[in-house]
Amino acid sequence: MAKKDGVIEIEGGVVEALPNAMFRVELSNGHKVLAHISGKMRQHYIRILPEDRVIVELSPYDLTRGRIVYRYK
């Protein structure tokens, strides 16, 4: 998988599931962000539940929103 320039990848835990495949994620540094599932995870029907450990990609332009790119097993 190609690495994207400028994105910040950080680990966190899902706090709550919101409508429209959105999730509130608490990052390892204590911040809470709003995150959605990446397209590949949606394609492969990967389910995310509260208390799952995930990796979130954050854009440097808006650090309050992110994309969930990986769920730990």
Swiss-Prot record:
Major site of localization recorded for this protein: cytoplasm
Keywords, ordered alphabetically: Cytoplasm, Initiation factor, Protein biosynthesis, RNA-binding, rRNA-binding
Pfam families given in the database record: eIF-1a
Protein name according to UniProt: Translation initiation factor IF-1
Domain of life: Bacteria
S1-like domain span: 1-73
GO molecular function list: ribosome binding; rRNA binding; translation initiation factor activity
PANTHER family attached to this UniProt entry: TRANSLATION INITIATION FACTOR IF-1, CHLOROPLASTIC (PTHR33370:SF1)
Presence of the UniProt keyword Protein biosynthesis in the record: yes
Coiled coil (residue ranges): none
